[in-house]
Amino acid sequence: MTAKEKIKAISDRYGYDAQSRQCIEEMAELTQAINKFWRKQLDCGKIELPKEADETFPVFCKEYDNLVEEIADVQIMLWQMEEFLHCNINPTVERKLNRQMERIENESLH
């Protein structure tokens, strides 16, 4: 069974009402995980994330592991929302990415 088929099966089993509420819960847990990682591993912003993963980056900590888990949970829920709403977000994502790139270009001109 592919990931897309699993998403459809899970969506069909639980329905929009239950899964939309679960999505809200998972997003709240992600918010908390981001905050804990920022606070405990990045010393409230005093430590910057490296541009690329390397041996100095604290990837082997419970806050990092929890953050990765919560990102996965939210991604799964968002795929279910796409399934429920019969939508393809890719064109919207592309449009928004392009808009942000334009903003960055405009910032560098000033």
Question: PLM features: residue spans?
Answer:
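Flexible "arm" and connector segments at domain edges
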Residues: M1-I71, Q75-H110
